[in-house]
Curated annotation (Swiss-Prot):
Region (Disordered): 394-419
Family designation: Belongs to the TrpB family.
Key words of the record: Amino-acid biosynthesis, Aromatic amino acid biosynthesis, Lyase, Pyridoxal phosphate, Tryptophan biosynthesis
Pathway: Amino-acid biosynthesis; L-tryptophan biosynthesis; L-tryptophan from chorismate: step 5/5
The organism of origin for this protein: Shewanella halifaxensis (strain HAW-EB4)
Lineage of producing organism: Bacteria, Pseudomonadati, Pseudomonadota, Gammaproteobacteria, Alteromonadales
EC number, UniProt record: 4.2.1.20
Identification of the protein by name: Tryptophan synthase beta chain
Length: 419
């Protein structure tokens, strides 16, 4: 049986404790066999179509583009059962777990979308489910926490480190190392040790394959660019995979610039990371001067990750894909803009990609076709955004009050001087 290549250029690999090597090799073998098994593929396709709701729509926005020369299409993964692209590959991995005879599923989650997708797949397929989630993310994603519990999952808050996604990943991996004989670690992004980046890409690649078919039907040609947000990078690699061999299509990933790409408050390892070993892989990693992992930051929990999938690192290194960034403020503005212009509330993660697409559309000087992966819906973010907007309103009122007070003081001083 052929084996998969564990590397993408210099990135990737299997940097895990020796105890986990048999589990990873078993997973690789099961995946290769499943790819060639007609019955497995039929069951996976049936679940995607009749349970998850594929294919998802490709929507031409009517009011979003600021430039008549540029059309912006949205690939509507927000319409998928579970609310995001995560459901695609979770169903694939859950079927693989059953194929390997596993009874339990371990997962990590940031925004909660992967946790929800894992919980629904486990409920459907009769698997026990436990999800590790950073304590900070538990607080800012309470609707998704309740959804997971409602579907029977055990949600375990992680308080170590920064209490965010990277810490949840570490705890999930630690748990798995003690019970891999009966449990499958259902990793949520196209990162981590081989064979996960390849498995996740293959179980997400229908995003780009559908997009290609749909845009050819609608426009008679391929898009000028496909755009997706990048944290670990699963939604982006799912969109990019079918376009990598189409050189006329630009592949654009959008990292979270947080408070500013040149501040310490961001989550952009492709911009400011150095190659390191993290989460079982060799990849760009946010590190301090002593090589320690730096804390990442983003307003969106799902992009709050200090590294990135190895295939994205390789695509950047060879110049096939470019990786831009969008700040918290740009994402928040676009979150509201899409809701007002199109009646669609995007996930904050997706809003980063849409923000960059709007910027690109504005600059177009010829007819331009842009497709953005709307990777998830924004229900989970409405309370977070409402709180931030309220804080901004209070701060603005304080500034205006201070300005008014200063003007009154100046006026009083002038009147006193005139006396």
């Amino acid at each position: 049986m052929s084996k998969l290549n564990p590397y993408f250029g210099e990135y990737g690999g299997m940097y895990v404790p020796q105890i986990l090597m048999p589990a990873l090799k078993q997973l690789e073998t099961a995946f290769i066999e499943a790819q060639e098994d007609e019955a497995f593929q039929e069951e996976f396709t049936d679940l995607l179509k009749n349970y998850a709701g594929r294919p998802t729509a490709l929507t031409l926005t009517r009011n979003l583009s600021p430039n008549p020369l540029a059309k912006i299409y949205l690939k509507r993964e927000d319409l998928l059962h579970g609310g995001a692209h995560k459901t695609n590959q979770v169903l694939g991995q859950a079927l693989l777990a059953k194929r390997m005879g596993k009874k339990e599923i371990i997962a990590e989650t940031g925004a909660g979308q992967h946790g929800v997708a894992t919980a629904l797949a486990c409920a459907l397929l009769g698997l026990k489910c436990r999800v590790y989630m950073g304590a900070k993310d538990v607080e800012r994603q309470s609707p998704n926490v309740f959804r997971m519990k409602l579907m029977g999952a055990e949600v375990i808050p992680v308080t170590s480190g920064s209490a965010t996604l990277k810490d949840a990943c570490n705890e999930a991996m630690r748990d798995w190392s003690g019970c891999y004989d009966k449990a499958h670690y259902l990793l949520g992004t196209a990162a981590g040790p081989h064979p996960y980046p390849t498995i996740v890409r293959e179980f997400q690649r229908m995003i780009g394959a559908e997009t290609k078919r749909q845009i050819l039907e609608r426009e008679g040609r391929l898009p000028d660019a496909v755009i997706a947000c990048v944290g670990g990078g699963s939604n982006a690699i799912g969109m990019f995979a079918d376009f990598i061999d189409e050189p006329e299509v630009a592949l654009i990933g959008v990292e979270p610039a947080g408070k500013g790409i040149d501040t310490p408050m961001h989550g952009a390892p492709l911009h400011h990371g150095k190659t390191g070993i993290f989460f079982g892989m060799k990849a760009p990693l946010m590190q301090d001067s002593e090589g320690q992992v730096e804390e990442s930051y983003s307003v969106s929990a799902g992009l709050d990750f200090p590294s990135v999938g190895p295939q994205h690192a390789h695509l950047a290194a060879i110049g096939r894909a470019t990786y831009e960034s969008a700040t918290d403020d740009e994402a928040l503005e676009t979150f509201q803009l899409l809701a007002r212009c199109e009646g669609i509330i995007p996930a904050l993660e997706s809003a980063h990609a849409i923000a960059y697409a709007v910027k690109l559309a504005k600059e177009a000087t010829k007819e331009t076709l842009l497709v953005v992966n709307l990777s998830g819906r924004g229900d989970k973010d409405i309370f977070t955004v409402a709180d931030i907007l309220e804080q901004q309103k209070v701060e603005q009122q304080k500034v205006e009050q201070q300005k008014a007070d200063n003007q009154n003081t100046e006026k009083n001083n002038q009147e006193s001087g005139n006396e």
